[in-house]
């Protein structure tokens, strides 16, 4: 028997799974599920405690590099009581998602929410919202996802 050292490719499986989840559960349930998956992923590997946004950005990019999930830029928007999270190069699951190719975006909401609220001085009761209108998905070769993280009271 010949043993190959090739890594398995799960892209076909993930694409079929994405279609089935969307068809059977619907978009809202799918997004809730994927947010929970993101929170679970964040619990499996967490950044160290960071004292600055810049330091946190470096640590988050190191974690993202471990799983080849792109990179992030964090901006604290003091006047808006928010953090702008720009994630570049999100892996695609074919054309799945709304807009097409962004099926994994809700995972980022859970992932960043848990990572950021684990930091000193972070707010606990938060809302992560996606700014689809600001995402120019056709102008870049890789997916760009823009999220805003706000305290629940500032989001209403």
From Swiss-Prot:
Top-level lineage group: Bacteria
Keywords: Cellulose biosynthesis
This protein's record includes keyword Oxidoreductase: no
A biological process from GO: cellulose biosynthetic process
Pathway: Glycan metabolism; bacterial cellulose biosynthesis
Annotated InterPro entries: BcsD_bac, Cellsynth_D_sf
Its biological purpose: May have a major role in the perfection of crystallization, involved either in the pore structure itself or in the organization of the pores within the linear array of terminal synthesizing complexes (TCs).
Entry protein name: Cellulose synthase operon protein D
Source organism (scientific name): Komagataeibacter xylinus (Gluconacetobacter xylinus)
Species classification: Bacteria, Pseudomonadati, Pseudomonadota, Alphaproteobacteria, Acetobacterales
